[in-house]
Amino acid sequence: MLGALKVLHNELSNLDFNVVAFQEIWLESSIKKFDNFAVFNSGLESKKHKFGYDFYVSGEFLKYVKGFKIINERISCFRLKAKWFSCTLINIHASTNEKNGRDKRWLLQLLKQNINQIAGSDIKIILWDFNTKVGNGNESLHDETNNNEIKMIQFVIPNGLNVRSTMIPHKDIHKETWYSADGRTVNQIYHVLISNRFRSATTDIRALRGPDTGSDHNLPKINFKVKLMVKTGNKYNEKRNMVNIFQNPKWKQEYAIKINNKF
């Protein structure tokens, strides 16, 4: 496993990745630090190599890590400190479209509870593997939708989130996040949700086809840049007192008398 992680680190370093969310790569719950990167792993309740979530962090970004929280085997949270805001990443893997609807509702309720616990000033980014085909976005790969898509939209709107992965224009090959073993079937089932307030900070989202990550998923890359609005205006633009009236000797004398009377 260590050798595979080093190969993965080399791939991610070549692509200039600093923080990466993974799924199903390590059995035990742990934080493993190496010379120039670290892996935060949520572990599993079962030993069947299903679920479990991980965050890879490059060495230069380790100093910005503020916390890693394991919710359960399907959800984990990762918090980073930035210059003006902190950023909370939520890695979630939901059931497939055919699974029990009650399990999906329970998972969404748990996700909502944890979102509500995040500081209001934080940038919230949800990395959503919900096996969802979204057919409503301007730049979605799919024309049709599935049941999971409806549940996601019902979750996004009341929680002040935006599905950015279907809003940024790209060729279809850069929207494909999953492919079948024979390469004939491709889907866009991995989505990026972000707080409405910071939706314009996502400058690019594209699925990379080249990295050798040992997965049947193409690795989506997110570029994120927050621009702060600077309040402009002349701070000296204040109403001036009518000092010209003191050029009149009469007003000048009356003003001096009133000032003396006050003391």
Where are these regions (language model features)?
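A shared catalytic/ligand-binding motif for oxyanion handling
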Residues: 1-263
